[in-house]
Amino acid sequence: MAIRQARDDDGPTLQLIDVATWSEDVTPAPTPQVDDEFFSGDIRSEDVLVAEAGDEVVGYVLVAPRYRGLTAGEHVQEVKALAVLPPSQGQGIGHRLVVAAVDTARNRGGRRLTLKVLGSNEVARRLYERCGFVVEGVAPGEFLLGGRYVDDVLLGLDLISV
């Protein structure tokens, strides 16, 4: 398994990963569609790292400036998305992608790396906490998903002291 920088031509594959991994248990975002463009708006290939098993992309992490274009916040990077195809889950790929995101954020001069995760997504929370992230805030009942209110949890990692 190797991790590399995404290329523009990875977009369709990354979109398929989003479709395959989407669940309201892990994201309040609308259901992604196969024909949506992955690299659009604020998502740039230089902000995405992909995990390859052989010649197949099996997961990705999107790590980008939290406040793109805002000088006062340029020291903060954010994990905006993490996804691993279901057959490849449980093999340490997510962990390796998070570690790569930490390295990328640090190499960009980041002092902090943050992310948000649903309070109900215990698997992801445990992964991030194993990587050194700590809870920095909770927005109780932030989303109504599947008929229940779910917290949005802000996690952070100090890139200077680790």
Region annotations inferred by a language model:
Residues 114-117, 129, 134-150:
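Conserved catalytic-core motifs of GNAT/GCN5-like acyltransferases
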Residues 148-162:
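Terminal substrate-recognition subdomain of acyl/acetyltransferases
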